[in-house]
């Protein structure tokens, strides 16, 4: 599967990059079974609530009580019960867990599943840790980027973060693994930077995914696109992005996803969410949540009750974050987009 089984936590991203054919077939096979049997396609493990940043658009930030966090040995039980084809490891900031490599190893099944994505701000990333996590089973590294310069530091409230990314990402991209994707959450603050951020991805030699801000996490509507001028900037920015696509598929979002993102911002809503069914969150202390912005908690063995109580009656239309946007499609559409993207990548 080339690109589009995708997901998000604080800055959620499930955007599958390049996957070998045998692994693609396993993912498609499990995804088909899960779709038919109402199991989740994507599970996001929020392995910590603590974070190194205090991002303006997020409800995480700073130290938290870590005493009740799941241990690495707890993860196989969740994997056996949920059997997702894609896993997102997120937070908070997952790199704050010193045992993160062990957690990743305990998520793996040994047969190429699940496809595993690390969502991080990369403030604590080093070359050694990148290589260790690749070896443990991380297939893709999703790195948050809000601005193409040190305004990123101000938005994330982390001085020096952009300089750290600018120094490290091109160096790791040059290793040739093609497993780094910048994730840019579009807000009223950075909507005019859509293509400048794309320029940065190109300059650093990595891929790019866009996601959409939701006010549900913090209650702050200031970062939504609240004016015709901002919507015009979004549309002109995405028009240019569409022109920049090429055979490398470095723009990870499918055209259908960007089109739906435009509609979300235009209407300030996106009905029809299947949180809890197609995707779900496992919190740092092991509870199930339908998503990272719906806070009803369920035990692992009560997943079916969560679907019945929440998903079947869910009227929330307040987000179009990545974890939702890439699964908010019919199964034939989801399958065809993944197969088409895979064949495009293999044909290079």
Region roles according to the model:
Residues 1, 70, 131-276, 284-289, ...:
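Radical SAM enzyme [4Fe-4S]-AdoMet core and its adjacent flexible, acidic
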Residues 3, 267-270, 285-348:
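Flexible mid-to-C-terminal extensions adjoining Fe-S/redox cofactors in radical SAM and related proteins
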Residues 3-140, 233, 341, 348:
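Conserved alpha-helical substructure of the radical SAM core
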Residues 36-46, 256-262, 280, 298-309:
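Short, intrinsically disordered, charge-biased short linear motifs at domain edges
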Residues 44-46, 88, 119, 183-184, ...:
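Short beta-strand segments
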Residues 50, 57, 275, 318-321:
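Short, cysteine/histidine-rich loop/knuckle motifs that typically chelate Zn2+
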Residues 57, 61-64, 279, 297, ...:
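Secreted/processed peptides and extracellular or luminal domains of membrane proteins
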Residues 74-83, 107, 172, 201, ...:
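Alpha-helix C-terminal capping segments
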